[in-house]
């Protein structure tokens, strides 16, 4: 699936990589497909669904297919500006779907409330587990995520009992305190992934849903089908305490490597690495990029053993649970100290009246920048709120307050947009 709202040049880059022989479009996208002018056949979706399948041809395809064959490619942003197509196999999706359905008790009684678009890796979980178990999938209209009360009313009318959302979507309900007056009596499973879940907002949800509701923090990139590690919330957390990402999923092995490719010890930071049946085959028609992150396991010199280096910096806490720190490329050196921007975000998120926040770094001016939304906030509020949580060298140098934080198409806080907003601000 391709987002028709993407810039035409980005779509062309994807088509140049994939070189598809055919494209299926709905009526609204026919003109856009024609503009691509790349020679592929274009088929109308409405006509296809009314066409009887050719059973013999389908059977011939099934007989040739093996579980190592690709089932789809999901495109994510690339450092060169050209999207990378992550190739997943039938085996990866089947193993992952079985684990997901069994772990979170997905069955024919499950009613998913879908928040993420179908071209985002999180949709793999809900879409394929629905097919696998006979569950029901309800697509929540995007505009409702700007109106928390209407969103809750929609969820109750649809009797939604399971959600798997990005935290930004959950934050919106918590920040407006929508559950103070409106209940979600059917909701029994709350799963989240895609970005760090602010503990303050999670605690709000936990106070307002029934005591037997299951909450879980899921963690993993597109390159691991969707998830590689997870943590089912089983204890209370302070508002300024990060939620662990937990332990490896079944058929996954996760471990933490230091820069010298040795295992990180207790409380040592390192890069999260993944091996197992959830792994992607690599990036479509991009062997160079594939070879950079899908590599031989340095802990095993005896036979071929591929791992994926996620670029996520993590460590084990004193309970032996993995805790996410930041992206490898979000680490900075400031005043001689190595700093994780994610740690600053966690501290600011815990401040009273803060709804959402993001931290960026001005390398040229050596400044830590905070953007946040909230209720009647000032720079003094933020500094007073974090001074007992952060050392002086980690305190924000500049703070900007927005009515609403920008989000990308997947619902995450858009840090690239914040970087542009900041650069424009500095040019004034």
Region annotations inferred by a language model:
Residues 57-75, 82, 106-112, 118, ...:
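Conserved pre-ATP/AMP-binding loop-to-beta segment of ANL
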Residues 4, 75, 103, 116-117, ...:
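Conserved donor-binding loops in enzymes that form glycosidic bonds
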Residues 132-135, 160-164, 174-244, 253:
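Gly/Ser/Thr-rich phosphate-binding loop
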Residues 14, 70, 90, 100, ...:
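Generic structural signal for small/hydrophobic residues in well-ordered secondary structure
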Residues 1-13, 27-30, 135-158, 164-172, ...:
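ATP-dependent adenylate-forming carboxylate-activation enzymes
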Residues 84-113, 121-161:
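Conserved AMP-binding/adenylation subdomain of ANL enzymes
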Residues 8, 23-63, 93, 214-217, ...:
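AMP-dependent adenylate-forming
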Residues 19-20, 160:
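Proline-aspartate-enriched helix->loop->beta-strand connector
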